Amino acid sequence: DFNHPSIFSWVLFNEQWGLQTKGGDGKDSWLPDTQEWVGRCYDLAKELDPTRLVEDNSPCCGGGHVKTDLNSWHMYLPGWKWKATLDEAEAKTFPGSTWNYVGGRQQGEEPMLNSECGNVWGYEGSAGDVDWSFDYHAMIDEFRRHPKVAGWLYTEHHDVINEWNGYVRADRSEKETGLGELVPGMT
């Protein structure tokens, strides 16, 4: 149902996986030929399904877009870092900007969104459920304060093998957020 209020899109590549070539210096690079191929993949996806948004690559770590309907990016930060990061992203996000694009390509009218975010310590080991709740609220509050941020995708709904940043534990049991101390019955 393409009229659903949630955003559904085809994401062709995630975090440049398989798109970069290792050079003689050992560094990965995203070659112009590969960028052109990704653009053709975008065109094909739009041809096959014109009802959906298409994202060429959901970038992180210095990657970027070639041809996309969504100017998205991945970012995992502690709550206190979000304001400065989003201030910078908003300042660099406008038609004609090359921020978050590769090969000299420029942004058009694509909306900006964080397509992968969560609590950074979830990847290194849990600092505790209460800290998870604090950073989660700080992050979401900053997204709401920045009007150019059209949306976000939280990773993930439940804890998995090496990522402890879900809303609930891997066994789907509730996490203790400490909010029950403020509002009885709320975890």
How would you name each of these model-derived features?
Residues 181-187:
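Surface beta-strand/loop "capping" patches
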Residues 177-179:
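C-terminal domain-tail junction helix/linker
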Residues 1-173:
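Substrate-binding/catalytic cleft of secreted carbohydrate-active enzymes
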